[in-house]
Amino acid sequence: MPKNKTHSGTAKRFRVTGSGKLRREQAGRRHILEKKSSRVTRRLEGTEAVAKADVKRINKLLGR
């Protein structure tokens, strides 16, 4: 059976950690930031772990 191809859009949005967990950027910090408080924009900094329900599907899209 042939290998699955990596979904390039998914590959750009998710990172695999050394232990194999998935990380993602948080939504809501790209534009229209003027009306958002500094507290909100700081809270959206950094990455977050992918929800347990989504891990299997994302791994499949990443060809893992």
From Swiss-Prot:
Molecular function (GO) terms for this protein are: structural constituent of ribosome
Family annotation (Pfam families): Ribosomal_L35p
Q: Which keywords describe this protein according to UniProt?
A: Ribonucleoprotein, Ribosomal protein
Q: Name the Gene3D superfamilies on file.
A: 4.10.410.60
Where is there biased composition of kind Basic residues?
1-15
Mind naming one GO cellular-component term on file for this protein? cytosolic large ribosomal subunit
Q: Where is this region: Disordered?
A: 1-27
Q: Which family does it belong to?
A: Belongs to the bacterial ribosomal protein bL35 family.
Biological process according to GO: translation
Protein name in the entry: Large ribosomal subunit protein bL35
Source organism per entry reads Saccharopolyspora erythraea (strain ATCC 11635 / DSM 40517 / JCM 4748 / NBRC 13426 / NCIMB 8594 / NRRL 2338)
PANTHER family given for it? 54S RIBOSOMAL PROTEIN BL35M, LARGE RIBOSOMAL SUBUNIT PROTEIN BL35M
Query: What HAMAP family does this protein's entry cite?
Result: Ribosomal_bL35 (MF_00514)
Q: Which NCBIfam families match?
A: rpmI_bact
